[in-house]
Amino acid sequence: AVVDVAKERNIPIRVGVNSGSLEKDLVEKYHGVTAEGIVESALDKVHMIEDLGYDNLVISIKSSDVMMCVHAHELLAGKTPYPLHVGITESGTVLSGNIKSAIGLGLILNQGIGDTIRVSLTGDVVEEIKSAKLILRTLGLRKGGIEVVSCPTCGRTKIDQISLANQVEALAAQFPNL
């Protein structure tokens, strides 16, 4: 029924697999939650939808384990013509989630894998968007914004460098298209 409606309206279907909800038979087959199991699950779902005559798909495979997520994307890349939505799921609070997302997405995107991204944080969704844009800019995949370069504080500092750097960064954020 869902495939029929998507077909009528030409709406893409997102095929999503999360390591936390991997099918029991695949967990048993691979002796635990693995990148191989995640990829097999995604491809099984893709083939099921293709067998129903539909191929307007987007694939999303995610894990909160950064290296498992990276490995799963490496395994899946090139095995399907469909766009890949990449992200590290359940990555954590703003600090830990940004670090996990930057490392994971950086490793994935730097290999040319991925068409859309999501940074998942336990926090304000606006922070997720800011983080995603910064990850893309840092990798040279997005233009715009002002990069604020500031060095660590030291004994030679005669001004409140931390406060100044924060003020400059806040000001720079007002000009995202420069």
Question: Where are the predicted features?
Answer:
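Catalytic alpha/beta core domains of metabolic enzymes, predominantly
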Residues: 18, 26-178
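Active-site-proximal beta-alpha core segment in soluble small-molecule metabolic enzymes
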Residues: 1-30, 34
